[in-house]
UniProtKB/Swiss-Prot annotation:
Protein's name in the database: Fructose-1,6-bisphosphatase class 1 1
Residues annotated as binding substrate: 103-106, 191
Pathway recorded for this protein: Carbohydrate biosynthesis; Calvin cycle
Naturally occurring in which organism (per UniProt): Cereibacter sphaeroides (strain ATCC 17029 / ATH 2.4.9)
CDD domains to which the protein is assigned, alphabetical: FBPase
């Protein structure tokens, strides 16, 4: 059975074969994760990627599986977070696909949700021209989350769709054609242990949230942090709120840590197509052009009003971002 047997009109015809291949591998990866520790150690380190990050066994397994499945498809160029350079799969192909085959792999041994993130552009004459372009030129992007449910969230530029894997039929079932980010929430996601390294506008925003009912926001907030981008994204699509991974003062973190091509652009596409916002803290993510395949960027996304508020904190005068929370010239609701 094909992985998307129902609602064939939901996927553009020119992308149907590629989506079938992605879906088939995602189902295989989900099964492999479910048997982790029985057949093999999926969490064991087996090398490093181009940026020196440790690669788990499942990182490599997933990358190899997606790449092999896309051979002979309409994908001309394949760029993976796990590989130094892009590769040509089909000289006659019309698409360029970037992928993070296994996002959140540091969570494998803890049984927290991990995922696959993908982005599809029209192929240009070269791999560099295909991938080093604005995220606004994407024709499709999405992610698969391997959790208590296996879900795929995907956009083809006309809203965001949600599919759930039916374990019985081993196929993805369309359950929502028009996912929307809830407009408000009292949740924010950030790694607070890095507070001392953040820029002042980010510290000011978090200070005002942490101040709760005693601060200018006049309400209490909850902090979340899962260290799995797909899990954070899935929660925000379900409950709203905002995710922040800012630049900071540490060496190697001047532009954040998340990669534009494999993580930020596709997630921003999914979120904005669902009515949310996505920026680098100040400017829209989808309006940016990466300088190299593994370029990084600060990343803020979630409910549109929350993202706009964080941008407003960057517009405050220096003395206000340094001031106690009661003195900022911002809207307070």
């Amino acid at each position: 059975m094909k992985p998307f047997p129902t609602h064939p009109d939901a996927i553009p015809a020119e992308l149907q074969d590629v989506m079938d291949r992605l879906g088939t591998v995602a189902i295989e990866v989900a099964n492999r994760i479910a048997r982790g520790g029985i057949d093999e150690d999926l969490a064991g380190l087996c090398g490093t990627n181009t940026d020196g990050d440790g690669q788990k066994a499942l990182d490599v397994i997933a990358d190899d599986a997606f790449r092999a499945a896309l051979e002979g498809s309409a994908v001309r160029f394949y760029a993976s977070e796990e590989q130094d350079t892009a590769v040509t799969l089909n000289e006659a192909g019309t698409l360029a696909l970037a992928i993070d085959p296994l996002d959140g792999s540091s969570n494998i041994d803890t049984n927290l949700s991990v995922g696959t993130i993908f982005a599809i552009w029209p192929a240009a004459a070269t791999a560099e021209a295909s991938f080093l372009r604005q995220g606004s030129e994407l024709i499709a992007a999405g992610y698969v989350i391997y959790g208590p449910q296996v879900c795929m969230m995907v956009s083809f530029g006309k809203g965001t769709q949600k599919y759930v894997l039916d374990p019985g039929s081993r196929s993805f079932v369309l359950v929502d054609r028009a996912v929307k980010v809830p407009p408000s929430s009292t949740e924010f996601a950030i790694n607070a242990s890095n507070y001392r390294h953040w820029p002042k506008p980010i510290r000011a925003y978090i200070d005002d949230c942490v101040a709760g009912t005693e601060g200018p926001r006049g309400r209490n907030f909850n902090m979340r942090w899962l260290a799995s981008l797909v899990a954070e994204t899935h929660r925000i699509l379900a409950r709203g709120g905002v995710f922040l991974y800012p630049r900071d003062s540490r060496k190697g973190y001047e532009q954040g840590r998340l990669r534009y091509l494999y993580e930020c652009a596709p997630i921003a596409f999914v979120i904005t197509q669902a009515g949310g916002g996505a920026t680098d803290g100040e400017n829209p993510i989808l309006g940016q052009t990466p300088s190299r395949l593994h370029a990084r960027t600060p990343f803020v996304f979630g409910s549109a009003e929350k993202v706009a508020r964080i941008t407003a904190y960057h517009d405050l005068p220096e003395q206000e971002t340094s001031a106690l929370f009661g003195n900022r010239g911002l809207f307070r609701s």
